[in-house]
Amino acid sequence: MAWTPLLLLLLSHCTGSLSQPVLTQPPSSSASPGESARLTCTLPSDINVGSYNIYWYQQKPGSPPRYLLYYYSDSDKGQGSGVPSRFSGSKDASANTGILLISGLQSEDEADYYCMIWPSNAS
């Protein structure tokens, strides 16, 4: 049986932090159920991803955004209540990017995904 591609829509720009930088996200990403999706959130060059928590939210039509997780480092991260462990965060310092990885995609994962940054207390 062929799977219908699962389309993960991403907001192309969203703002966060005190100075309201523009965070860049690709306009969309698609994958099939059971596969993994890697969603990115690229910070402007004058802001170092290493100094910020990256927050991720999921929004489905007609519903408010749902907090998924935040990621600062492997030892400083947090999962939202009821959010499955197949949602995980990371960073790519060389690309100045925050990453949301969704493994074992399910049809219910079809949604808009938003990133937000906030300065870390650890920095």
Curated annotation (Swiss-Prot):
Residues 54-70 are annotated as: Framework-2. It is found in: Secreted; Cell membrane. Disulfide bonds join 41-115. Pfam families: V-set. GO terms for cellular component: extracellular region; immunoglobulin complex; plasma membrane. Residues 20-44 are annotated as: Framework-1. InterPro entries: Ig-like_dom (IPR007110), Ig-like_dom_sf (IPR036179), Ig-like_fold (IPR013783), Ig_sub (IPR003599), Ig_V-set (IPR013106), IgV_Light_Chain (IPR050150). PROSITE patterns: IG_LIKE. Residues 71-77 are annotated as: Complementarity-determining-2. Residues 116-123 are annotated as: Complementarity-determining-3. Keywords: Adaptive immunity, Cell membrane, Disulfide bond, Immunity, Immunoglobulin, Immunoglobulin domain, Membrane, Secreted, Signal. The keyword Cell membrane applies. Residues 1-19 form the signal peptide. Residues 45-53 are annotated as: Complementarity-determining-1. GO terms for biological process: adaptive immune response; immune response. Residues 78-115 are annotated as: Framework-3. Residues 21-123 form the Ig-like domain. V region of the variable domain of immunoglobulin light chains that participates in the antigen recognition. Immunoglobulins, also known as antibodies, are membrane-bound or secreted glycoproteins produced by B lymphocytes. In the recognition phase of humoral immunity, the membrane-bound immunoglobulins serve as receptors which, upon binding of a specific antigen, trigger the clonal expansion and differentiation of B lymphocytes into immunoglobulins-secreting plasma cells. Immunoglobulins are composed of two identical heavy chains and two identical light chains; disulfide-linked. This is Immunoglobulin lambda variable 5-37. It comes from Homo sapiens.
